[in-house]
């Protein structure tokens, strides 16, 4: 486990040697020697892992190595900080820089020599403790792209959630959901121990076509052990999709009772389905039920819980359904579907070994799929190694195999994937994790290395998808064939928290207690109120990351003058001070909730963060002042509503730019944005005299663009047949996967052009107008998976029988109700049509 940290630090030394070309020779030589020694120590750590040495001596030695690796990182980051602070000085003070740099070099040489003495002591103790048999680090020397290619070969194709052994349960519960004679609000409780598949069964019901057709209003929310009723109510309101973004920001400030009244009003008189996943206390249901009308529309509520008393403790009409363990035959079927993906020939010995291990899983689906994910990447001969490892740890039948399987699966991960898994411990229980945000955080932390073939974000996505493929992480939402959000099962989250604690990796604070508290921990995370955290007044100068997931609160007690090594700041809903003191040279990620900005001098602060990679400002805030990003040449993602002007320089690595005004976009130099993948251009002015101009020529350089959104509250006339548009769109259409157009009035039918885009998977036309007929030919939209046409006006829409062969989601709504629709019946079955 410690090997993940040491390999990360070894990589950091290597990167530092490359980046600091002007480094003094003495510093360079000492660092190279230190890197060699730490690489060697890393090999012995791998040996400790491989031999499964868990004696106190090995643990003590591993702890020495862990502390040493962290101290190496501190020395490097502090030295880099001093160099950057000197490089920013101007005027006469520059004359002293040369002397200062030499003094800094002498200082780090002294620090490194102390570290070298320590590593010699660590080596002597290794020999004394008898830790030998050097094992080379796995994947050493491979480039990121090569490791990803190896992962890609081992990955399965996109797999829908497999539900084995629950077919009868699903049939019974579906009948309860669709019972037309039951007009009252009816509650279905699914209960059983963790890992049995309660959430999987509930999701199967929630996503079934019959349920979608029956319930126009559906919502899903998680509860968990540490819940706030107001948060749960807000999640239900958001999930229903009945409330505008502007309205959502208003009701975020409501008290709990006001939210109850608001949600009740939304659902009154409607046939709804609400899934409340993972309830631990009856009080949680008592807090929610007042907001869910007991109407006579045939509404339903599904509850999942581990506790029988909670399942049967709901009032009103209900049905409690207990999930059972899988039979051996069902267990083997589930295992076979996942474990044999890369094995062509299954001999008798292999089958026997597999069945012995599956038997030990005792019918627990989560244990079975994690075991299958572990074995699916191994050769038949390696199956015996896993089996032997299980037997060594299972001293008697009273020990459950699940924790052992989870631990083995973690140990088999590459160090990058281990760091990704550990990082999942920062998120609250049952939290739906936005995958793009997770990727941006992992890159900002320095855990991911790219190369000339692959961007760091692509590498990070593959490591996360490896966790999904191994069933260590669950995909929740997909778009365009990609995972967009994920969730970690609470049993696996417990594993991540336990290992993070052992590695001094994360401090997590909640209302009750810090799950792990240390003044030298790298990351500090607050899940609920900030007051408890700030009241302890700890000073952790080694902190690299601070993240806040709690409710609205004031930021007090964080002294940024002493936190100069910070790489990640995600303030969440904290009310920010007027300014942040200190030069945060190492900062790579800054996340801000718009409701918390107030007098925060966002423009002045952002412009100083020269090495920032990701700037995220939540979409509930419109930045109307000009933001100067010209010195921020490392930017990769700029996310927010920047309508006051955005000054951008040479940012070749910029991949995300959402959203800026049309005027700001037209002033940029798109030829510098060669890696831009996601672009959002929006106009906020509602003036009818205001004419918005789309410069199509500005898009011709964006050959990497995948997602394009153009939005305006005023009517913008758009032609896709002008010479400029045709020339520009011919370039970007080759890469586009998603197009969203809002408030556009088309001068001609856009479909003949849009349907030819070879990679287009999502098309959304919202509040658009076209006075004519839209036609989709038989060969049109070959890869399209989602089509939303929410038009203000449209005379006619015709889709030929063979068009859109891959469509799985369809919604058509036209305010002008006399629209003529000619749509194949097979497509009508995929969605909702209101015309």
UniProtKB/Swiss-Prot annotation:
Reported impact of residue 670 to H: In strain: cv. Nd-1
GO molecular function, one term: ATP binding
Annotated GO CC locations: cytoplasm
Effect seen on changing residue 346 to N: In strain: cv. RLD
Outcome of mutating residue 113 to K: In strain: cv. Nd-1
Outcome of mutating residue 253 to M: In strain: cv. Nd-1
One record GO biological process: defense response to other organism
Protein's name in the database: Disease resistance protein RPP13
Species of the source: Arabidopsis thaliana (Mouse-ear cress)
Coiled coil (UniProt feature): 25-41
Superkingdom assignment: Eukaryota
Signal peptide: none
Miscellaneous note of the record: In cv. Nd-1, it confers resistance to Mask-9, Aswa1, Edco1, Emco5 and Goco5 loci from Hyaloperonospora parasitica. In cv. Columbia, it confers resistance to Wela3 locus from Hyaloperonospora parasitica. In cv. RLD, it confers resistance to all of these loci.
Effect recorded for residue 181 to D: In strain: cv. Nd-1
Impact reported for residue 558 to P: In strain: cv. RLD
């Amino acid at each position: 486990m410690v090997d993940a940290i040491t390999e990360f630090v070894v990589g950091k030394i290597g990167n530092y040697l490359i980046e600091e070309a002007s480094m003094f020779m003495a510093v360079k030589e000492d660092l190279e020697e230190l890197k060699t020694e730490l690489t060697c120590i890393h090999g012995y750590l791998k040996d400790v892992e491989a031999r499964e040495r868990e004696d106190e001596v090995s643990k003590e030695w591993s702890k020495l190595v862990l502390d040493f690796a962290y101290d190496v990182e501190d020395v490097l980051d502090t030295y880099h900080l001093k160099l950057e602070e000197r490089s920013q000085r101007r005027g006469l003070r520059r004359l002293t820089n040369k002397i200062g740099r030499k003094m800094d070099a002498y200082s780090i040489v002294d620090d490194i020599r102390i570290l070298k003495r320590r590593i010699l002591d660590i080596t002597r103790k290794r020999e004394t403790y008898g830790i030998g048999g050097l094992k080379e680090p796995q994947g050493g020397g491979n480039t990121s792209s090569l490791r990803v290619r190896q992962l890609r070969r081992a990955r399965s194709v996109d797999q829908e959630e497999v539900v084995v052994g629950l077919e009868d349960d699903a049939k019974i519960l579906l009948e309860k959901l669709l019972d037309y004679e039951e007009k009252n609000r009816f509650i279905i409780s699914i209960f059983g121990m963790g890992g049995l598949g309660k959430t999987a069964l509930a999701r199967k019901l929630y996503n079934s076509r019959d349920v979608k057709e029956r319930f126009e209003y559906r919502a899903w929310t998680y509860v968990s052990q540490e819940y706030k009723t107001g948060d749960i109510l807000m999640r239900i309101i958001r999930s229903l999709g009945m409330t505008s973004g502007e309205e959502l920001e208003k009701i975020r400030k409501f008290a709990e009772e006001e939210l109850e009244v608001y949600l009740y009003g939304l659902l009154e008189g409607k046939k709804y389905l609400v899934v409340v996943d993972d309830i631990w206390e009856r009080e949680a249901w008592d807090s929610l039920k007042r907001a869910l009308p007991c109407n006579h529309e045939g509404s339903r509520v599904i509850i999942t819980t581990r506790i029988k008393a909670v399942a049967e403790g709901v009032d009103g009409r209900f049905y409690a359904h207990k999930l059972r363990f899988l039979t051996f035959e069902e267990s083997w079927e589930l295992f076979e579907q996942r474990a044999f993906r890369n094995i062509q020939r299954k001999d008798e010995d292999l089958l026997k070994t597999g069945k012995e291990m599956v038997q030990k899983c005792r019918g627990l689906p989560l244990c079975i799929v994690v075991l299958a994910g572990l074995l699916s990447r191994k050769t038949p001969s390696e199956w015996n190694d896993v089996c032997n490892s299980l037997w060594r740890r299972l001293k008697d039948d009273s020990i459950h195999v699940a924790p052992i399987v989870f631990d083995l699966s973690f140990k088999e991960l590459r160090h990058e994937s281990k760091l990704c898994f550990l990082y999942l411990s920062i998120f609250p229980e049952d939290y739906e994790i936005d995958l793009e945000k997770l990727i941006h955080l992992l890159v900002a932390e320095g855990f991911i290395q790219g190369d000339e073939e692959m961007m760091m974000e692509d590498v990070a996505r593959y490591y996360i998808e490896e966790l999904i493929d191994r069933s260590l992480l669950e995909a929740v939402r997909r778009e365009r064939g990609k995972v967009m959000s994920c969730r970690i099962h609470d049993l696996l989250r417990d594993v991540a928290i336990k290992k993070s604690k052992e590695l001094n990796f994360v401090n997590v604070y909640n209302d009750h207690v810090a799950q792990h508290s240390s003044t030298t921990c790298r990351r500090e995370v607050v899940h609920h109120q900030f007051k408890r955290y700030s009241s302890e007044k700890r000073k952790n100068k080694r902190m690299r990351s601070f993240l806040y997931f709690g409710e609205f609160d004031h930021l007090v007690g964080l002294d940024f003058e002493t936190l100069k090594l910070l790489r990640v700041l995600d303030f969440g809903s904290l009310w920010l001070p007027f300014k942040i003191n200190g030069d945060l040279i190492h900062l790579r990620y800054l996340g801000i909730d718009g409701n918390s900005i107030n007098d925060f001098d966002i423009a002045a602060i952002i412009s100083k963060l020269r090495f920032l990679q990701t700037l995220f400002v939540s979409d509930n805030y419109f930045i109307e002042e000009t933001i100067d990003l010209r010195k921020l040449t490392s930017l990769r993602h700029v996310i927010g509503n920047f309508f006051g002007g955005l000054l951008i320089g040479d940012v070749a690595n910029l991949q995300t730019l959402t959203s800026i005004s049309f005027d700001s976009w037209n002033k940029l130099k798109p030829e510098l944005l060669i890696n831009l993948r996601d672009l959002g251009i929006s106009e906020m002015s509602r003036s009818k005299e205001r004419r918005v101009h789309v410069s199509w020529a500005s898009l011709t350089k964006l050959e990497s663009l995948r997602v394009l959104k153009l939005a305006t509250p005023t009517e913008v006339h758009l032609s896709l047949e002008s010479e400029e548009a045709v020339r520009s769109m011919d370039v970007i259409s080759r890469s586009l996967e998603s197009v969203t157009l809002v408030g556009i009035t088309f001068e001609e039918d856009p479909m003949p052009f849009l349907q030819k885009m070879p990679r287009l998977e999502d098309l959304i036309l919202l509040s658009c107008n076209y006075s004519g007929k839209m036609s989709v030919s038989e060969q049109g939209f070959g890869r399209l998976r989602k089509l939303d046409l929410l038009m203000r006006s449209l005379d006619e829409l015709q889709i030929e029988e063979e068009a859109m062969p891959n469509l799985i989601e369809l919604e058509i709504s036209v305010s002008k109700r006399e629209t003529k629709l000619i749509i194949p019946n097979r497509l009508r079955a995929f969605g909702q049509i209101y015309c």
